[in-house]
């Protein structure tokens, strides 16, 4: 994350640590699209994953195909009239099957992916990821997929060995990786059930995202590879720039107080962080929900940010997200689309008639979800849904 990188620079400089912090412009989209053609099954899983208000239009945007190719795909599959209609979670598997059976779409996705690979490889090499210097990735986390994709790209470039990653938290791990290369601070796939339940990665991303838009690719300018970023949101940019100045001032003061970095009360700090996050994320005051819930939010490709972090939900929509109602729909026993909020807890406090009841029922849902994930790791539908939202924007 951008703000964590800026704060880390303060600590490195103030404490004269033998480290160099570099910022890598990337996103799940900018890393995955160039690699689609190397594993089309995984690519289809990615573009047909869940999220907030997933539509056919959104799925085709994830594929990276051109506008004309998108229009032809819609026509071939008879989806022109439903392109912007929100899809129930249980429909995503059917959408994937239809796309897999469309040769035109698969070819278009493969060709566009191959074209993007040289620019990704060029950028990673330019930024020094092939250097022999010991290095590691640091990120907010959630699925650990970007580390795997960066390592795949570096392997194409001839790098031996694997980069390790250090994360705020991980809900799950990619398949085919070495567990010892993934390090978690706050929660991990195996531990931290209560922390996960009272945590909102969507709110975390809203507050700590970068002021620039999402990285969508790379282009060469004046002999250098430069990131191509989406336009972002001006309101969000102003908030993040103000937050950056506050955090940097805080980091400066904290760094001055540290006499011996080896004697920091890490466990005490972790407990205090957990206490504060549980309260703010899991049971916010009205003022907190209003301040952070009204930040623009996007969980997908290209920062349209047409919704708020705490989306406005009716009483009926809040109840539809209660444990039993949500599980029935996710399992396919009940039909219909359920409107979700990136930060449900904020929405419940702002718009619910009985926010205490709403928060309790949503916590039950999250407990059941993460418990089922832990004890049924082979259930793909659960793996795909373990999220408030897994936002598309990420930088390292």
PLM regions and their residue ranges:
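Long, low-complexity, Lys/Arg-enriched
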Residues: 1-396
């Amino acid at each position: 994350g951008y703000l964590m990188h800026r704060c880390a620079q303060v600590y490195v400089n103030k404490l004269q640590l033998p480290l160099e912090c570099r910022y890598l412009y990337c996103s799940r989209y900018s890393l995955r699209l160039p690699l689609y053609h190397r594993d089309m099954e995984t690519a289809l899983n990615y573009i047909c994953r869940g999220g907030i208000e997933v539509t056919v239009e959104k799925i085709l945007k994830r594929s990276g195909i051109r506008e004309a190719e998108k229009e032809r795909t819609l026509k071939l599959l008879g989806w022109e009239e439903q392109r912007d209609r929100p899809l129930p979670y249980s429909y995503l598997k059917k959408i994937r099957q239809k796309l897999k059976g469309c040769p035109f779409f698969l070819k278009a996705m493969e060709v566009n992916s191959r074209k993007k690979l040289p620019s990704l490889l060029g950028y990673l090499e330019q930024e020094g990821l092939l250097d022999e210097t010991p290095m590691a990735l640091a990120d907010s986390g959630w699925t650990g997929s970007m580390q795997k994709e960066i390592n795949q790209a570096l392997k194409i470039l001839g790098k031996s060995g694997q980069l390790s990653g250090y994360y705020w938290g991980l809900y799950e791990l990619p398949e085919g990786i070495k567990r010892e290369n993934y390090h978690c601070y706050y929660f991990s796939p195996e531990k931290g059930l209560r922390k996960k339940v009272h945590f909102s990665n969507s709110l975390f991303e809203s507050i700590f995202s970068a002021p620039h838009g999402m990285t969508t690719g790379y282009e060469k300018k004046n002999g250098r590879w430069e990131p191509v970023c989406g336009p972002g949101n001006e309101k969000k940019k102003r908030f993040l720039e103000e937050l950056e100045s506050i955090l940097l001032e805080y980091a400066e003061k904290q760094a001055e107080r540290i006499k011996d970095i080896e004697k920091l009360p890490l466990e005490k700090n972790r407990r205090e962080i957990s206490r504060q996050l549980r309260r703010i994320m899991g049971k916010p005051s009205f003022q907190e929900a209003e301040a952070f819930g009204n930040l623009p939010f996007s969980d997908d490709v290209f920062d349209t940010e047409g919704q708020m972090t705490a989306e406005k939900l009716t009483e009926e929509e809040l109840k539809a997200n209660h444990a039993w109602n949500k599980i029935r729909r996710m399992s396919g026993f009940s039909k219909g689309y359920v409107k979700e909020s990136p930060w449900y807890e904020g929405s419940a406090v702002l718009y619910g008639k009985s926010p205490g009841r709403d928060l309790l029922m949503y916590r039950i849902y999250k407990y059941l979800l993460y418990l089922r994930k832990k004890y049924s790791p082979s259930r793909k539908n659960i793996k795909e849904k373990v999220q408030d939202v897994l936002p598309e924007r990420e930088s390292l």
